[in-house]
Amino acid sequence: MNKSNRIQTAELDWEFIDGIEVPISKQFGDVYFSKDNGLLETRHVFLNGNDLTERLANLQDFEYFSVGETGFGTGLNILALWQLWQQVRPNNHSHLHAISVEKFPLSKADLIRALNVWDELKPLSKQLIEQYPLPLAGCHRLSFPEERFSIDLWLGDAQDIFPSMVKTKAVNAWFLDGFAPSCNPDMWEQNVLNNIVRLSDYGTTFASFSVAGVLKRGLKAHGIDISRPRGFGHKREMLKAVWKAPVSEEILLEPVSDTLHFTQQHIAVIGAGIAGLSTAWAFAQRGHQVTLFERTAPLSGASGNPLALLNPKLCPIEQSHEHLMTLSWQHALNFYKNFQAFHPIQIQQMALKNAQDLLDLADQYPADIVTQQTSSLESDYPHILLTEAGAVSPHQLRAEILQHPSIELKIANITTFVSFENKVQLKSGNETTLEADHVVVCCARESAALFENYPLLKPIRGQVSWVDNSFATLPLNEAYSYGGYCMQLNTSELILGASFYPNRDDQEVLLDDHVHNFELIHSVFPHYAKQLPPVEQWQGRASVRAQSPDYFPVVGKMQKESRISTFAGLGSKGFLFAPLCSEVLVAQILGEACPVPKSLLQKLDAQRFQKKVKPKKPYFKSQ
């Protein structure tokens, strides 16, 4: 993605036409929807043009249908699609997923204003607006599990985004929307169309209000059959197309994941830390049966601290579209807000080293996300205020996840797997415990015992401390980050973290670590730290994190054709990384759209540490 990667929101004019307020793009000089009736045009061109009423109504149980769109705009097309889905969807576990791209997203205020026109869509508009993402580049997944509907909204330039998309599932239908080719020629470049076809398959359909030559030629180059039925309103024609013909040599069919079609899957998840819990939840939300195994008790490892802070280290804005921590932070906030265990907060991130680099982020990110303000605790260090953050109560989250009717917890020590036909047997000693369709191993460093050639995960000891501060409590909705962190654990106790000792796996609570945590807060907030009780009165918990050699989680299959996957190596950011990475894992296993770009998926790939076997060159003896 190019360096000018700061997302600019759309600049709009507004015009009343036949009593409807129509938004007009200043950037492109074109309307966002038809002046005749935008909703009726959407139904005529995109829904009918892709024969979606019949196709959606006939989806089989657990079938996954995806619709791609080239310009999100006001979201009108997606809302009309969602409304149709409500009307015709079969009473089974089929799922509808929409993928859309937008270079200039509307501000939330403008989106509310634009969608206010459509009374019949207001219940859906409200749900969309509640999850409408921050104006940051990259993929934003919006999930509506009760509707069996989801949206991947990619913010950025279509010329950069479509080549970066991973093809884990072919798109079934396309809305070729966006402003007219004469107003927005970049949208209709051959590179964009090539990648739209790459993400498709035989049987994929296409529809557009435009019959411009550049679009017709771009599709015909790949053997796609085009027809031109009557357009909407005053428009004589529209484009309707289906991919029937053999593909050209330039764009060969890209293979997709081995999908498990149209049946409920039984998934075994080994390990009930945050990696295992989030993975179990992701499968269960899709209607699959999950058996979650834990050797002792859920959250007995590094995930079991009294509190987890969602505290991202932000990157320069031009890297945000493929930066795991930034993308995970946005996804995690949307994920955890569905649980009572989540508490929205703001975080004062103190600038200790390279202070100007941190302060510069406040100028790069939207002002309502990151700002510079005076710290509420006296300190000599400058800081930025991250207004979109959160804290999670791990044990409350565990209880909520385990209440899911499709998740069963079993206490057992799984020691081996036996694969046969399309199943995997899980064994505890010599006894078969379960047969599953797929297994996901989430056992941190102990995952290595269940695989050959597993990457070496480094142990990192960490201890959190908590202490009575009822005499000087901090705001409940605020945390402080300074190399360590502190915030209210409850109304009378302060939690502080965390020590960080690589290559140590001891888990005893130590006074030295309390001293370490005290020295961290004292170095930044000395006046406040002096009020705290002596460290001998502190309580704590020590645990061991698992860290991969390159600091990225290990996600996916260790062998290409295997039904056994892994998810481990989350380090100290487990609660931040887990929700997004579990969606990536599920996409690979079930054959769904992947919510991260190729570049990031390669960094997560569980096979990335395996040595590549180089073919031997033939040896020729000289004569």
From Swiss-Prot:
**E.C. number, please?**
2.1.1.61, 1.5.-.-
Query: Where does this polypeptide localize?
Result: Cytoplasm
Segment tRNA (mnm(5)s(2)U34)-methyltransferase: which positions? 1-244
- Gene Ontology terms, cellular component aspect? cytoplasm
Swiss-Prot/TrEMBL GO biological process terms = methylation; tRNA wobble base modification
Enumerate the residue ranges of region (FAD-dependent cmnm(5)s(2)U34 oxidoreductase).
270-623
Main role? Catalyzes the last two steps in the biosynthesis of 5-methylaminomethyl-2-thiouridine (mnm(5)s(2)U) at the wobble position (U34) in tRNA. Catalyzes the FAD-dependent demodification of cmnm(5)s(2)U34 to nm(5)s(2)U34, followed by the transfer of a methyl group from S-adenosyl-L-methionine to nm(5)s(2)U34, to form mnm(5)s(2)U34.
> What is the name listed in the Swiss-Prot or TrEMBL entry for this protein?
tRNA 5-methylaminomethyl-2-thiouridine biosynthesis bifunctional protein MnmC
The organism named in the record is Acinetobacter baumannii (strain ATCC 17978 / DSM 105126 / CIP 53.77 / LMG 1025 / NCDC KC755 / 5377)
